[in-house]
Design a protein with these regions (language model features):
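PLP-dependent amino-acid enzyme catalytic core
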Residues: 1-172
Length: 172
């Protein structure tokens, strides 16, 4: 899937200003052409979902094995106001699956277009973010879709935890 480690960049002027030996930042602007680390969370959570469904060990798994293990067409759904939805859409496309991304009212057309370019269905609701999250959950349950939401609530913590674990892979 085109993985490349992203570089560490030295901020020499800033380290001199603060009188420290070195300040390094991780440059995520080249991450799969998405310019954001957020895709790490959604893609990791989707991989974990698939590993759970197909009894695979995520610690000993190639992308090709994961993709070839999928036995049925799946749809991944989420609510976003930007980069998380792009990450879910990107991961679904890489795996040959569907993504339906809901966005709250007032979402920028540029962000909608970025999700559409990744092959996902993108629907802007007339609701605020929290209501859109609830709507996404209800719609996904009704349609048999997998929700990959980065927001946790009582009874829904496993996938948001996986998303956070995916963000942590940035340091690997």
């Amino acid at each position: 899937a085109g993985y490349q480690p992203t570089p560490l960049v030295a901020l020499n002027e800033l380290s001199a200003l603060f009188g420290v030996q070195k300040i390094l930042v991780k440059d995520e602007s080249r991450r799969f052409g998405l310019n954001a680390f957020k895709m790490l969370g959604g893609s990791y959570a989707i991989a974990r979902l698939l590993c759970e469904k197909y009894h695979l060990d995520i610690n000993d798994l190639s992308f090709e094995t994961l993709k070839s293990s999928i036995k049925e067409k799946m749809t991944f759904a989420t609510t976003t106001d930007g980069n998380h939805g792009r990450g879910v859409a990107w991961a679904a496309r890489q795996l040959g699956q569907n993504a339906v991304i809901y966005m709250p009212k007032g979402s920028a057309q540029e962000r909608v277009d970025a999700i559409l370019r990744l092959g996902a269905e993108c629907i802007v609701t007339d609701m605020n973010y929290d209501d859109t999250v609830r709507f996404t959950m209800q719609t996904a349950q009704k349609n048999g879709w997998e929700v990959v939401q980065d927001t946790a609530w009582e009874g829904y913590t496993k996938i948001p935890t996986w998303i956070m674990q995916g963000y942590a892979t940035l340091a690997d």
